Amino acid sequence: MRFFPSFQSATRNFASGLKQQFAGKFSAPNLATPYNSGIRGVWIPSTDCKVLTSKQRIADAMDFLADTGFNTVFPVVWNRGFTAYPSQIMREQFGTEIDARYQGRDPLAELIIEANRVGLKVIPWFEYGFVSSYNLNGGHLLAQKPEWAARDCNGNLLKKNKFEWMNSLDPEVQDFLLGLMLEVARNYPVNGVQGDDRIALPCEGGYDAKTVKRYLQECGREAPQNPREQHWLHWRAGIITEFVARLHRELKAINPDLLLSMSPSPYEWGLVEYLQDSKSWVDKKLVDLLHPQFYRRDFNGYKQLVDRLIDRQLTCEQLHCVSPGVLLANRGSNYSMNPELLLQVIAYNRARGIPGEVLFFYEGLRDNGNALAEALKNGPYAR
């Protein structure tokens, strides 16, 4: 890695220490086991969710999910510029090994142990991707590395929906995030890693001097002021696709059975707004699992996204890798899905040949006296 020459030796030492610390507690993940009945997954965030705050809460959550019928958990490990595991890269680059909330612990290791105990697969979720901060003017990452900032056409720090962005088109920034994801894949017995809808860049970005110069050199034209101009948009989306390809290639070099999971915004909106060409990712076989975020609060809205995906975007042969993201709850808007809608959504997935889904998020299962969990346990997730 260009930004961290001692990466290989450092991660070897780190992994050795980790294995000693948790000797006998990890069991090797069964990477090759296919999802014969589809993914029944759930995201475990650190925002509006207390699961990761203690070993006991982690153990209780894994028991609850296994009893409900889930087979995969996606725990957050990268959020607001900090990791939920002790990171050699973060210590070397930013002097902060782990999120301060978890000082003296390793929530990822604790969760893997408990998930193994009840037979759940673990795919760590890099929620923030190329985002540096939320409403903090770039946060500690860009305070220390201002050259990593993404820029809009006016030269300002790129912000969208209060999120501030690193420049995901910059090779050094790409090396950093890739390093974090491979660090987890090398050092923990996981089933894969997951990128979110922030393995992306808002289309308004890419106007930093380095990227504009690269565009001129490669394409012989100036970057247009219109961020949605087709050539400029697809050129930048291609750089994101190249990053996904590199991530896939280097993940498989660690272990060919490790899964690359991606959860992009719905195509084509994700392409136009966030440079996520998820159709190309699938066409080029760069992802093993795709969880487009079909976060709709009514059945017809969800159905339209599924129909568009199946009828216009993917082939029948590609459908096996798809498990859409389904919105169970949103604390900001006080939304909680009702059991009837959840069962209707899952039934439609199966009717259209979609074998599974990933639910956002864990706490939604516990709302209203575990109403959604009970509906799953007594219905489509019954053993």
Model-derived regions: residue spans:
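Aromatic-lined substrate-binding rim segments of carbohydrate-active enzymes
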Residues: 79-127, 232-247, 251
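Substrate-binding cleft of secreted/luminal carbohydrate-active enzymes
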Residues: 288-302, 320-383
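Boundary/entry segment of secreted carbohydrate-active catalytic domains
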Residues: 29-54, 264-266, 329
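Glycoside hydrolase catalytic-domain groove-lining segments
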Residues: 218-334
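Aromatic- and acidic-residue-enriched segments that line the glycan-binding/catalytic groove
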Residues: 85-97, 130-159, 195-224
